[in-house]
Amino acid sequence: MAAAAGDGGGEGGAGLGSAAGLGPGPGLRGQGPSAEAHEGAPDPMPAALHPEEVAARLQRMQRELSNRRKILVKNLPQDSNCQEVHDLLKDYDLKYCYVDRNKRTAFVTLLNGEQAQNAIQMFHQYSFRGKDLIVQLQPTDALLCITNVPISFTSEEFEELVRAYGNIERCFLVYSEVTGHSKGYGFVEYMKKDFAAKARLELLGRQLGASALFAQWMDVNLLASELIHSKCLCIDKLPSDYRDSEELLQIFSSVHKPVFCQLAQDEGSYVGGFAVVEYSTAEQAEEVQQAADGMTIKGSKVQVSFCAPGAPGRSTLAALIAAQRVMHSNQKGLLPEPNPVQIMKSLNNPAMLQVLLQPQLCGRAVKPAVLGTPHSLPHLMNPSISPAFLHLNKAHQSSVMGNTSNLFLQNLSHIPLAQQQLMKFENIHTNNKPGLLGEPPAVVLQTALGIGSVLPLKKELGHHHGEAHKTSSLIPTQTTITAGMGMLPFFPNQHIAGQAGPGHSNTQEKQPATVGMAEGNFSGSQPYLQSFPNLAAGSLLVGHHKQQQSQPKGTEISSGAASKNQTSLLGEPPKEIRLSKNPYLNLASVLPSVCLSSPASKTTLHKTGIASSILDAISQGSESQHALEKCIAYSPPFGDYAQVSSLRNEKRGSSYLISAPEGGSVECVDQHSQGTGAYYMETYLKKKRVY
């Protein structure tokens, strides 16, 4: 048999070499590269093995092939337990036993496949407590076939390769029954399917020397002595522009005529680089493989290896094409991942901004996801998108990024501060009852907000809602509010120090100017905010101030007080660009066509500030409290406040249903204001609480 195979191989080599335009075949027969060899350098032909070594290898392969030691014992009595199964199989070494009473089935693992076969013969159709038992091998779905393994791999090296991905039940290489050498593929069965799936993904395309491994699922019923030898060959490393199927068929018909021979094609076009040839028997395929491996076709030295056994040639070719596609794409998605610059440019699209702001606008769900954004992080600062924003925030002043993008990035950094400020006012007035964790220390909020002292709010706040003098008493001192306003951003169309709109009452007109903003702070933000001239200006109120007051004086007072009292734990805020920290006042970046007013409204807007607006809103009573609760961000940075906010949000299931403004607006909003902030503030103050 060995002599016949050798003669056939020599003739096949000569025939294949002649068809390819080469010399005698024996000199062309390589057996493939080793794991240690350099890529493209084939191993020399392995030396002939001693007959005893060949017999030992084949015996080891047969032992592992039949080493299926897991059995099923079916049709057990309903009340059976593991002890009864142990007593039934007391003559065998049980490694594992589990009884499923619902299925009336026992899952048993014995010492080896020999005991499993013996137990099947002994207890199949065995009568046990009036039931005829059904004993059979357990099916497995964790079996893989690994091809393109270097032929120099030993069984120990192959086991080390596959064991890295999980516990294995068995593994073995397939050896030639003629020469005893490895045929370049093997099988591995894992304990769990998860291990097998991981190994398949990791091994697919893994480079070992000049070979790229290929892993695929296998049917356990194919693990039989007459079925594990493959009839299909893969001709790899063909010229990429090779299209001559007739020539390829002629070359591989010199020794034995194949039943299938085709170049790789994907959707009618040639993939290039490899082909599949199928023969009638495994012996014919082995002879051709030995003769053709390492031959040259059109200047390229091809690699001829065995495919996985069991499937016909056409199915094998389709599986190889699919695997080639996966390896070329490096197991990535169909669409490439966008880089940070592309993400930033997409922020100019209102639809993209709306998607990003969706969690912030809709609030937190009643029951947050187990693996969702941490409670201590705002929705827009979750780990999935923060790297791109952190990277792009460094280059946000570039003209390529656009005005809207820069505004959006700045607002992201201001959201936590706005949450702290609004939550402070809510806890002072609307939260008369102590929280579940007690009252938070005032020093924490003061330090985080950069405010030197507690805002001097009077105790009678909220008892007499309609009195103007109560509202005026809520205005803090000049130094305190100026320090607080150092943390609050403004838009460029707002008045600077000493420029405020006309008052609503004589009482308010008599109040001194307490809030100012340095004009120089707006110089850096002008290019980025010109597209938002009407945004949120009308809803921000400050103590009214006569226009005759000198502008430089107010500027000096404001900037001096802010520099003395800003001692934030988070560091100094950016001074060049100051934007609104309230996410609800920045909706123009999401819906510019709805939020932005006509250009004519620029001249009629009354410029105001946010601190007095919040204080006046608090003095309005219960409805103002509801409005402030809806303005509060739903993911505050501090855990103490997250408790209160979450409890209130659980009671409130309504969405933000915006109604048209009605006549007789509340006192804290100017009747002539046309800005978006005024519109939303009016709506919030009028809405009723919905449970």
From Swiss-Prot:
Residue stretches making up the RRM domain: 69-140, 142-220, 231-309
What are the GO MF terms of this UniProt record?
A: RNA binding
**Where do the record's region annotations for Disordered lie?**
1-47, 492-522, 543-574
Q: Name one GO cellular component term.
A: nucleus
Q: Which PROSITE patterns match?
A: RRM
Where are stretches of biased composition, namely Gly residues? 1-30
Query: What residue spans carry the Polar residues bias annotation?
Result: 548-569
- In terms of superkingdom, the source organism counts as Eukaryota
Function text: May bind single-stranded nucleic acids.
Q: Quaternary form? A: Interacts with PTBP1 and RAVER1.
The protein's name is Ribonucleoprotein PTB-binding 2
Recorded name of the encoding gene: RAVER2
